[in-house]
Amino acid sequence: MVTRRFTEEAQRAIEKKIMKLKEFTSYLDSAIPLAYQESYDNSGLQIGLPDQEIHSAMICLDVTEKVVSEAIEADCNLLISHHPLIFNGIKKLTGNTYTERILYEAVKNDIAVYSAHTNLDMLSDGVSHKMAEKIGLDKISVLSPSDNRLLKLVTYIPESHFEKVKIALFEAGAGVIGNYDNCGFAVSGTGSFKGNETTNPFVGERGKIHSENEIRFETVLFTHLKARVIKALVEAHPYEEVAYDLYALENNNIGIGLGCVGILPEPLPEMDFLNLIYSVFDAKGIRYSNPTGKMVSKVALCGGSGASLINEAIHTGADVFLTADIKYHDFFKTENRILLVDAGHFETEKFSREILKDLIIKKFPKFAVRFSETNTNPINYF
């Protein structure tokens, strides 16, 4: 039985910031959109009631029994992990598996659990980008851009309200293309309409055809923002019936996707690059393919299990592909075209905790948040 110890730090946390769990998760769901996650994933709120009050959070890579015990001792009532505790359906809660025991202990102690997994991987400033920063890469871009997550919005706005509606759309999140925002295209034209006897038109008279100088405005948005953007459009637009069209786009989403590619400040011999990875990631069991004999300048990388991106890394012309969980036969695929480096799953994703903490502090600077001190890496090296 684990007993809760009410610490002075927890008391300070309560004095600084208490909020509803739904306020916290609503922000994270927006900052790390759940729509970005892969179909097999289960990111988001795993345990907790929306109206539950939270006062301090602990960030970890994995939720384990020791991490839950640590949270109880530190009086943290929210755990935020990279890897979800629950991937598949739980059919019973008897304590026979480690997942069941963790769930039981967390629920019993009113500890909420939130996870940000592949949606955090997809972010332009996500797990792989953090790896790239840690080893000092420049000119960082996405290795495997995501697709089918963009919509084009076309709407028609009277000239008198164009700026108001445009600003409302941009504030709702529309108009972002890569590192650019407030992106749109406008062209003037003439719109016509006739309202029936039940209408109350903003311009013109009911029952009569009316022509109005309007601006056709086009912009783009991510699919997960559709409801928010349309709500902003309808609220800012003066017409009773707002005319708009939404089109699904097949464009790659610049800035969203798996992995990164970047350039080292100075080329390194392959063994020196391996020493850099050993030092930065504290990677004690690096596996790598046969050296190519080339200097390392262009680096492709993907935090966690990224072997599926080997061919894409080769096609970028990268000298090295740094990732984890590479299978034996995958090492044959390179044919000496690229150096494959497996630095470990835990090692390549452990900096995800820093991303989560920075996001939280940015929005809630007075909310108490700490890193778990428990090493959750299940792999040991002899």
Each predicted region: which residue ranges?
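Hydrophobic structural segments
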Residues: 15-382
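Short, low-complexity, charge-dense intrinsically disordered segments
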Residues: 1-16
